[in-house]
Curated annotation (Swiss-Prot):
PROSITE patterns listed in its UniProt record: ABC_TRANSPORTER_1, ABC_TRANSPORTER_2, PHNC
Gene3D superfamilies xrefs: P-loop containing nucleotide triphosphate hydrolases
Protein name as it appears in the record: Phosphonates import ATP-binding protein PhnC 1
Phylogenetic lineage: Bacteria, Pseudomonadati, Pseudomonadota, Gammaproteobacteria, Pseudomonadales
Subunit relationships: The complex is composed of two ATP-binding proteins (PhnC), two transmembrane proteins (PhnE) and a solute-binding protein (PhnD).
First-tier enzyme category under EC: translocase
Enzyme Commission number, as recorded: 7.3.2.2
Function field: Part of the ABC transporter complex PhnCDE involved in phosphonates import. Responsible for energy coupling to the transport system.
Family named by the database record: Belongs to the ABC transporter superfamily. Phosphonates importer (TC 3.A.1.9.1) family.
Native source species: Pseudomonas aeruginosa (strain UCBPP-PA14)
Topological category with respect to the lipid bilayer: Peripheral membrane protein
Main location: membrane
Length: 278
């Protein structure tokens, strides 16, 4: 099986400070993968590169392929980047909605990558596209809010609108950057339930950066742990031990771990970690 996402020898430097070191990663179709690590570990930087929103180093920067096509290499984005972005749904931590537009209009924006630019700029969406957008809103439990301005919604509701937009985009790969970081536990659970449902029932590949490890244990069969721009672990989430996680997060202490008794027992019953080699 060919990888849906292939990262090969990725390096990234910001103002002479290297942020990513020779990262190698393959993700198969239909996987749900958590990228975990402390703040500044490189997980969001990695995700932005996979989305084509950031460029790797020009010298020895490595390459990234998505859906079997070259996205970028050695600091240059592929000529196919616009078409590839149409297949990549990106969910931002801060929702990235247009507050002055209605909820429905925000979801319709997901179609822009697959329609002529002149039609998109004029907002000429078809009746079928509007039907699909309403269907996507119903799936995330927000059909009744279609006519409201996006700015009137809570943070959790706005994040669900962003997911509905990715559904209308018909993306094969969904990348979610800290989608629950600013949400209360109930809103976070709803967002993760929806992402898991899309992965399970639609077969979409989902990669999500998470600070809260208990959500990675609960929702993502595979975890990739980063520290200082290097991959330290890549494997089953069940194999993450509390000792390793305490070392991974260091001075941040217990805050991101949030182990439930069940999660803690599951992690502690697993064999010792085998660290990935960067």
């Amino acid at each position: 099986m060919s990888a849906v996402i292939r990262v090969d020898s990725l390096n990234k430097t910001f103002a002479r400070k290297q942020a990513l070191f020779n990262l190698k990663l393959e993700i198969q179709a239909g996987e749900m993968v958590a990228l975990i690590g402390a703040s500044g570990s490189g997980k969001s930087t990695l995700l932005r590169h996979v989305a084509g929103l950031a460029r790797c180093d020009r010298d020895n920067g490595g390459s990234i392929d998505v859906l079997g096509r070259r996205l970028q290499a050695s600091g240059r984005l592929s000529g196919e980047v616009r078409r590839l972005r149409a297949d990549i749904g990106y969910i931002f931590q801060q929702f990235n909605l247009v507050n002055r537009l209605s909820v429905l209009d925000n979801v319709l924006l997901g179609f822009l990558g697959r329609m002529p630019r002149w039609r998109g700029s004029l907002g000429l969406f078809s009746a079928e596209q509007k039907r699909q957008a309403l269907e996507a809103l119903a799936r995330v439990g927000l059909a009744d809010f279609a006519g409201q301005r996006a700015s009137t919604l809570s943070g959790g509701q706005q994040q669900r609108v962003a997911i509905a937009r990715a559904l209308t985009q018909k993306a094969e790969v969904i990348l979610a950057d800290e989608p629950i970081a600013s949400l209360d536990p109930e809103s976070a659970r709803k967002v993760m339930d929806i992402l898991a449902d899309i992965n399970r029932h639609d077969g979409k590949t989902v990669v999500v950066t998470l600070h809260q490890v208990d959500y990675a244990l609960r929702y993502c069969p595979r975890a990739v742990a980063l520290k200082g721009g290097r991959i330290l672990f890549d494997g089953s989430s069940e194999h993450l031990s509390e000792g390793f996680l305490n070392e991974l997060y260091g001075a941040e202490g217990d805050t991101p771990l949030l182990f439930s008794d069940r999660a803690r027992r599951g992690a502690e019953s697993q064999p010792e970690l085998t660290l990935a080699r960067a």
